[in-house]
From Swiss-Prot:
Job description of the protein: Component of the velvet transcription factor complex that controls sexual/asexual developmental ratio in response to light, promoting sexual development in the darkness while stimulating asexual sporulation under illumination. The velvet complex hat acts as a global regulator for secondary metabolite gene expression. Controls the expression of the cycotoxins fumonisins and fusarins gene cluster. Involved in cell wall integrity, cell surface hydrophobicity, hyphal polarity and conidiation pattern. Required for pathogenicity against maize seedlings.
Subunit structure: Component of the heterotrimeric velvet complex composed of LAE1, VE1 and VELB; VE1 acting as a bridging protein between LAE1 and VELB. Interacts with VELB and VELC.
Localization: Nucleus; Cytoplasm
A single cellular component GO annotation: nucleus
Organism: Gibberella moniliformis (strain M3125 / FGSC 7600) (Maize ear and stalk rot fungus)
PROSITE patterns: VELVET
Gene: VE1
A biological process term (GO) from this entry: sporulation resulting in formation of a cellular spore
Domain spans labelled Velvet: 26-220
Name of the featured protein: Developmental and secondary metabolism regulator VE1
Disordered: region residues: 206-435, 447-517
Record remark on domains: The C-terminal PEST domain is a region rich in proline, glutamic acid, serine and threonine residues that is required for the light-dependent regulation of development and secondary metabolism.
Length: 531
């Protein structure tokens, strides 16, 4: 078995190679070939059924330059690359960078040469940049197996003029006019597996220059390098570890990585609401949110009218235990008593700071001001209904506050009457003194007989004409054609003309046409026609 000391070191290869030959016409020609762009890396494309379509080109693509100089020496000669009448092509072959030691048992896989796929031959392109010369470009070279390889380029020439032939044919196996000239090798490059491939770098400036002149070279504007973290024991994964561990590592790299739960950025922020923690049992689900909840509660009533502890809210809409309408505040019966509205309470927010602006009465109802609630004196009595129309002043308006001036409107809960537009009354001045008659408590509150139900404020609106509900007209009301089958050349009768006239109207000055609703109408024409 070969030891590392017995393996010869790989000599450094020259990137420039020259040959000299003399033609039949006694011309002294020098061939100089240079590898301008060396291959660095490649990804193995495999040897399966999809390897031919799954190309993984060598990166960067190899570029070889050729110059032809005529003269006694390279330094004293003349560059005739563009003037020399011949065709050149370069053939690429793949070789192992290090010689493989032969084992005791010769296996078929050990004797097989490495497989190079793609387009291994390239013709010479005459380019002006980076310098005027001939260039061979290999943008489609792929390697099937991973390892360390080198590329060998062999130059062949097809001579066109007889004076440029060799004095003696060099190789008898080649057809006449085709001669092998020289070869050059690249530096070693690595071919990685799909798991270990580091990625592709941005295209080189030489590749961009060649592509700008029309050569088929793929250009990458960004870097596509993988960022891999070093794992313990990754260096000896090929020599050590069993196949199960390698498969597990491969599966871990391919699967989608889910962020850990301890990552603070991956956890969704929880709601700051504590409504679920302070939820009380048997909540009032029938209550609707209203604008009244946005204001502070009104001041408590006088001590003589202190209600039961059950009345703790200003308004309870939809609550079966609460009164349908609040009972007006009761005052002593004093004839000729004048009540002056006082200034707004300090605990109320000013009108300009209210979050709601004053609006007119919606849906055409009369604007009504709801006074502060005053509960019933006795909880056992039924809450009576009373009429609170604007035209009848049967109670004293409350002190001007946000409850009376901000426009809390109430809608009648009688859906049997359609809404009727009513002009909103003029707002009363806040600081004007109004003289009102005394309240009659006996008429407002009766412990025995309930008040009559609320009546509509205006008479019923006149009935509107019926509105046609959207629908389609019948077919026979639009189209006059018959639906019966036609036989023996029969045709539908054209409704635009009479039955006795086929294609013509009875009068030359009059035409008939069918409207969209199925009606037949006529139109008068000018009297310019031949008799």
């Amino acid at each position: 078995m070969a030891t590392p000391s017995s393996i010869p070191a790989e000599p450094k290869r020259d990137v420039v190679n020259r040959i000299h030959r003399v033609t039949r016409g006694n011309r002294s020609l020098w061939y100089q070939m240079t590898v301008l762009q060396q291959p660095e890396r490649a990804r193995a494309c495999g040897s399966g059924s999809k390897a031919n379509s799954d190309r993984r080109p060598v990166d960067p693509p190899p570029v070889v330059e050729l110059r032809i100089i005529e003269g006694p020496s390279v330094e004293e000669g003349k560059d005739i690359t563009f003037d020399y009448n011949a065709n050149f092509f370069l053939y690429a072959s793949l070789e192992h960078a290090r010689p493989l030691a032969r084992g005791r048992v010769n296996t078929p896989a050990a004797g097989n040469p490495p497989i190079l796929t793609g387009v291994p031959a390239s013709g010479m392109a005459y380019l002006d940049r980076p310098t005027e010369a001939g260039y061979f470009i290999f943008p489609d070279l792929s390697v099937r197996h991973e390892g360390l390889y080198i590329l060998t380029f062999s130059l062949f020439e097809t001579t066109k003029e007889e004076r440029d032939f060799d004095l003696e044919p060099a190789d008898g196996d080649l057809p006449p006019g085709v001669d092998y000239r020289m070869e050059i090798k690249t530096d070693p490059f690595s071919v990685y597996s799909a798991k270990k491939f580091p990625g592709l770098m941005e295209s080189t400036q030489l590749s961009k220059t060649v592509a700008d002149q029309g050569c088929p070279v793929r250009i990458r504007r960004d870097v596509r390098m993988r960022k891999r973290e070093s794992k313990p024991g990754a260096g000896n994964s090929n020599s050590g570890g069993n196949g199960f561990e390698r498969r597990e590592e491969d599966f871990g790299r391919r699967r989608t990585i889910t962020p850990a739960s301890e990552d603070p950025h991956s956890i969704r922020n929880r709601s700051h609401s504590n409504s679920s923690e302070q939820r009380t049992p048997y909540t009032d689900a029938s209550r609707r949110p209203s604008m009244v909840d946005a204001y502070p509660p009104p001041p408590p009533p006088p001590p003589s009218y202190e209600p039961a502890p059950s009345a703790s809210r200003h308004l309870d809409f939809g609550d079966s235990s609460a009164a349908q309408y609040p009972t007006p505040r009761q005052y002593a019966h004093q004839p000729g008593l004048q009540i002056t509205p006082g200034p707004p309470s300090a605990s109320y927010a000013p009108t300009s700071q209210s979050p709601y602006s004053k609006t007119d009465a919606p849906y055409g109802y009369v604007n009504r001001n709801i006074p502060p609630s005053c509960p019933s004196p006795a909880p056992s009595l039924k809450h009576e209904l009373y009429d609170r129309r604007q035209s009848t002043s049967t109670y004293v308006p409350p002190s001007p506050s946000v409850y009376s001036t901000e426009g809390h409107h109430r809608r009648d809960s009688r859906p049997s009457y359609p809404p009727t537009p009513v002009a909103a009354p003029r707002p009363r001045p806040m600081h004007s003194q109004t003289s009102l008659p005394a309240l009659k408590i006996d008429q407002l509150v009766s412990p025995v007989s309930p008040l009559p139900p609320i009546e509509p404020q205006t008479g019923p609106a006149p009935e509107l004409p019926p509105i046609n509900v959207g629908g389609k007209r019948k077919h026979e009301s639009v189209f006059a054609q018959s639906t019966r089958p036609l036989h023996n050349g029969q045709r539908q009768v054209d409704p635009h003309y009479g039955r006795s006239h086929r294609g013509y109207s009875p009068d030359h000055d009059q035409g008939w046409y069918s409207r969209a609703d199925g009606q037949i109408s006529s139109v008068q024409f000018n009297r310019y026609y031949d008799e």
